[in-house]
Amino acid sequence: MEKVFYVTTPIYYVNAEPHLGHAYTTVVADFLARWHRLDGYRTFFLTGTDEHGETVYRAAQAAGEDPKAFVDRVSGRFKRAWDLLGIAYDDFIRTTEERHKKVVQLVLKKVYEAGDIYYGEYEGLYCVSCERFYTEKELVEGLCPIHGRPVERRKEGNYFFRMEKYRPWLQEYIQENPDLIRPEGYRNEVLAMLAEPIGDLSISRPKSRVPWGIPLPWDENHVTYVWFDALLNYVSALDYPEGEAYRTFWPHAWHLIGKDILKPHAVFWPTMLKAAGIPMYRHLNVGGFLLGPDGRKMSKTLGNVVDPFALLEKYGRDALRYYLLREIPYGQDTPVSEEALRTRYEADLADDLGNLVQRTRAMLFRFAEGRIPEPVAGEELAEGTGLAGRLRPLVRELKFHVALEEAMAYVKALNRYINEKKPWELFKKEPEEARAVLYRVVEGLRIASILLTPAMPDKMAELRRALGLKEEVRLEEAERWGLAEPRPIPEEAPVLFPKKEAKVEAKPKEEAWIGIEDFAKVELRVAEVLAAEKHPNADRLLVLRLSLGNEERTVVSGIAKWYRPEELVGKKVVLVANLKPAKLRGIESQGMILAAQEGEALALVTVEGEVPPGAVVK
């Protein structure tokens, strides 16, 4: 039976430039599409741009442009952005295309003739940026919950879709299909929405106010509400209702979205599908927000926006793709920063993977006449053939960061193997065994390169070229040992991941004296480590349980590189006890422990003697 996979991004609204949130969702979709193609699935990957609506119309007016010229220009920027990121989509749909307009009007007519659309008046609180009405309860301090902007009170005649009619059905469907909306927290959020009336959905705007949109097929004086229009892209791109692509791919649809558009995709879209007689999608996969380095939602006003294209230019697209997939647990709000990217780049890509390839090439020339040696049994490295089987469910469960961690753990095992076997010494006494060691490392790198291809397609093709391996690969080839064929390797190969030096601007030294009253504000106390464990969502962090004598605290600390959890228990450390609590990757840290650091060396500040937990440090 043919394996089929269909993945979509949201179609991006063209009122602004592509940003890191757009890039992340699109990289995840591209990773999933590449993984499934590699695994033999017939795959279709859809992205595109959402080009109608009041916000776009206003943006075009502000730019002094015709709306069509405006959307053509901005949509082109998204296409160029995805080219820069190496996004291999199968189709890029635009809602201004005739093929999309035809499907929107067909579905509208079908739902209207079934009696599920009626004309009425609506008065409510409207956010122009969202192009949505909100209830008083949904606002945050009177502002739009997504954009934080004032809403407008509006009253006008619109056509309405009988969405409330389908609420009981949707409630039951979600309860009977527990993996429909993922991760589970978002499923629970949607069920909470559906626990009370959701009302009917306004699906039109008067053409006199918003002329930029798809006209209703029965009333030319109204254009289609942007969400009713945009959501239908997922089937219009498949040539709904008669297209072969629709019949093949729609039953296997995975939507990827950000949590800010959960309600339209989890409530509006399913009820629209039900009313139109279209089967439900397979999965709705909801991503969290990308936060600035300060842990707050990115905002130009706060000055904490990370520019993906500046990072791409500096580190290369595959490094950026790897960082986003490896660092961010899908569905969670996660801080991103250039510093974190640089750390991940240097540790995983330059030091572990890139350096291993360079060392292996050098030893092949030195000890194997510049050739891949004859195949040999894999010994412990043959365990790598089981990795693909372990990674498949992780990818299907959206645990990309864990899948990549496992793949890179194998690369680390290859490094350990070559260091332990020391082929440079072995060659003096047992040259054949030295060549066998090198074959095993080359074969291990072949397996690792296949597993890492969906994340870093260009660099993994480069890796295979550098080692004389065939470039075209399939996932099943990572499940077999001994496929690296004896052959010469290229004499020249670029460094896969050159070291990146952090640029530090020289600043004039300034005196920064503080008074005793400033220092007195910091409350330092002795704390005893009762327990320590690895952070479930970050391999650089440890979670410590500390005793201050009369109370216990949880502290998250970035010391996992230097300390194992078990060696911390019983130590007396110095805690900044009056630091405001902060969430670090989902766990609240109630203070900070002190450490001294110089370069790569780090040591905790500890207290000797009989000083009890809770004692003040002066």
Swiss-Prot record:
Q: What is this protein called?
A: Methionine--tRNA ligase
Keyword flag Transport: no
The gene it comes from is metG
Write out the residue ranges of the motif 'HIGH' region: 12-22
Q: What's any GO biological process attached to this entry?
A: methionyl-tRNA aminoacylation
Cellular component terms per the entry's GO annotation: cytoplasm
Subunit relationships: Homodimer.
Cofactor(s) recorded in Swiss-Prot or TrEMBL: Zn(2+)
The record lists the catalysed reaction(s) as: tRNA(Met) + L-methionine + ATP = L-methionyl-tRNA(Met) + AMP + diphosphate
